[in-house]
A protein has these predicted regions:
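C-terminal catalytic histidine-bearing segment of alpha/beta-hydrolase fold enzymes
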Residues: 219-225, 229-264
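A domain-start/cap signature at the N-terminus of enzymes
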Residues: 18-51
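Short, surface-exposed "cap/lid" segments of acyl-processing enzymes
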Residues: 37, 45-81
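Active-site nucleophile loop of the alpha/beta-hydrolase fold
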Residues: 165-174
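Gly/Ala-rich beta-loop-alpha elbow adjacent to hydrolase catalytic centers
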Residues: 141-146, 150
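The feature captures the conserved acid-bearing segment of alpha/beta-hydrolase catalytic domains
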Residues: 173-231, 236
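Alpha/beta-hydrolase active-site loop
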Residues: 105-131
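Cap/lid segment of the alpha/beta-hydrolase catalytic domain
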Residues: 88-114
Length: 264
């Protein structure tokens, strides 16, 4: 009887694990991370062994749907030597595809950059995409909250990313929350400024800041730039005429800055 009960329990566990896996994984629309589906939007002609793999990370959109701006970057940046993907952070949607996990309470109602819940799934999705597409160079671009995640990922996963591009970065999360005077201080969130000593010295980093950005104030990017310079990281700081809304009001300006950083 005990043996039979054990077999039934084992069967139930196996069934649960199988059901929890992301059966939609195709490395085009979804990738599986620890049984969860992480949603993607990317180039139509995805081929392995292209020279570059470029990943784009969005900010903290309130409706948990990243909209069409960042997905539109894909066609502007891709070429025959590049695979380009937008990754929807846990709990967010891209083109009606939703990533599992995240915080259902929404932006400003809880920490947005908790490592295990919000950042690790993205990093592991990037790792799987890198293993699958086998690029010579992996480039990660993040805007606003996506830039914060980018800074944490390069600090936590040394050697994973070859070139990081951070735009409108709240690179010191505790100080940024104080500056914004919104919600809590997000004490459980990871912050890029705490992780600079762990960053791979061979990485290239580009930091893009809007001169009039009153959301993620330029000072947070400038301070992060100084920290990277002290660690002898190859880092470039580029200031442009614009603010935090330039991403959706003048997207071509951001696209051109990304292209310039990639080609430099």
């Amino acid at each position: 009887m005990k043996k039979l009960l054990g077999i039934l329990v084992l069967g139930l566990l196996l069934s649960t694990n199988a059901h929890s896996a992301c059966e939609k994984e195709d490395f085009i629309k979804y990738v599986e991370v620890k049984g969860n589906c992480i949603a993607l939007f990317g180039t139509k002609k995805n081929e392995i062994n292209k020279k570059q793999l470029i990943i784009l990370l969005h900010g903290d959109h309130r409706k948990r749907d990243i909209g069409g701006i960042l997905p539109a970057f894909v066609n502007k940046i891709e070429n025959k030597d590049r695979n380009v993907f937008v990754i929807a952070r846990p709990g967010w949607k891209v083109k009606k595809r939703k990533s599992d996990g995240g915080d259902s309470r929404g932006v400003d109602r809880g920490d947005n950059y908790i490592f295990i819940r919000d950042i690790e799934p993205v990093a592991l999705a990037i790792k799987k995409l890198k293993e699958h597409y086998n690029p010579e160079e992996l480039i990660l671009f993040g805007y606003s909250g996506g830039a914060a995640l980018t800074g944490v990922i390069i600090g936590k996963y040394s050697g994973l990313i070859d070139h990081a591009i951070l735009a409108g970065c709240p690179c010191n999360v505790p100080e940024w929350r104080k500056y914004r005077k919104k919600g809590s201080g997000w004490p459980r969130s990871s912050s890029p400024h705490n992780l600079v000593s762990n960053i791979d010295k061979d990485i290239k980093v580009d930091i893009l800041i809007g001169k009039n950005d009153k959301n993620t104030h330029p000072k947070f990017s400038e301070q992060y730039y100084d920290l990277l310079k002290k660690e002898n990281i190859d880092v470039t700081l580029t200031s442009f005429n614009g603010d935090h809304s330039t991403m959706w009001k003048e997207p071509i300006k951001i696209i051109n800055l990304i292209k310039k950083a990639i080609d430099s």
